[in-house]
């Protein structure tokens, strides 16, 4: 009798290797220059994601960090403050990009395995008329959480957070690098 032992490394999705089928698909894929919107694979992917999220368009980025940092830059001004969980990827694993790229500070909330609640966010919004504190302009969530061990937000809580952000004029960004896991 033989015993087959298979080792599965779940430390990160970056340690996986493509299967032969995946390699064959990559080698046979139709390609083009995505800069000129000529890559059918990228175009199809962006259209499918936009449709899935009921948005007019989507934009594919080569990395989650680049995506997050671009979103932060778009939604803030230098000197602003964003709200995130203390385990958040944008604070812990993006090389200080929030402050370096956008001149923004982070107000960290101690949530539950990387998830923060609408009530915690409400308590953390700086008073807009108090000029000694930075303007709160953005809330950043991560679903599923990385450092939180893959915890998943309850959809109702995300809706509460979204409504809170709208009420207070805050942008809301969801780091969805592991969204398909949710």
How should each PLM-predicted stretch be described?
Residues 102-163:
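PLP-dependent aminotransferase-class I/II
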Residues 10, 49, 67, 98, ...:
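Buried hydrophobic positions in well-ordered alpha/beta secondary-structure cores of metabolic enzymes
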Residues 74-92:
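Conserved PLP-anchoring active-site segment centered on the Schiff-base-forming lysine
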Residues 151-182:
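Catalytic PLP-binding core of fold-type I/II PLP enzymes
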Residues 19-64, 86-87, 91-92, 97:
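Conserved N-terminal alpha-helix of the aminotransferase class I/II PLP-enzyme fold
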Residues 56-75, 109-110:
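Conserved core of the PLP fold type I
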Residues 82, 105-106, 172-174:
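Hydrophobic beta-strand scaffold residues
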Residues 6-25:
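N-terminal amphipathic/basic leader segments beginning at the initiator methionine
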């Amino acid at each position: 009798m033989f015993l087959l032992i298979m080792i599965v490394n779940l430390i990160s999705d970056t340690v996986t290797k493509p299967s032969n089928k995946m390699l064959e698909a990559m080698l046979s894929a139709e390609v083009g220059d995505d800069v000129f919107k000529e890559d059918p694979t990228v175009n199809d992917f962006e259209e499918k994601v936009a449709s899935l999220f009921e948005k007019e368009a989507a934009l594919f980025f080569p990395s989650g960090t680049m995506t997050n940092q671009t979103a932060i830059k778009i939604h803030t001004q230098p000197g602003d403050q964003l709200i995130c969980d203390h385990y958040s990827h944008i604070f812990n694993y993006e090389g200080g990009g929030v402050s370096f790229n956008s001149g923004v500070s982070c107000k960290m909330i101690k949530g539950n395995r990387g998830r923060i609640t609408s009530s915690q966010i409400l308590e953390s919004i700086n008073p807009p008329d108090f000029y000694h504190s930075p303007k709160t302009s953005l809330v950043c969530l991560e679903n599923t959480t990385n450092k939180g061990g893959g915890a998943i937000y309850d959809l109702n809580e995300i809706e509460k957070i979204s409504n809170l952000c709208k009420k207070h004029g805050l942008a809301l960004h969801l780091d969805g690098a592991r969204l398909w896991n949710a």
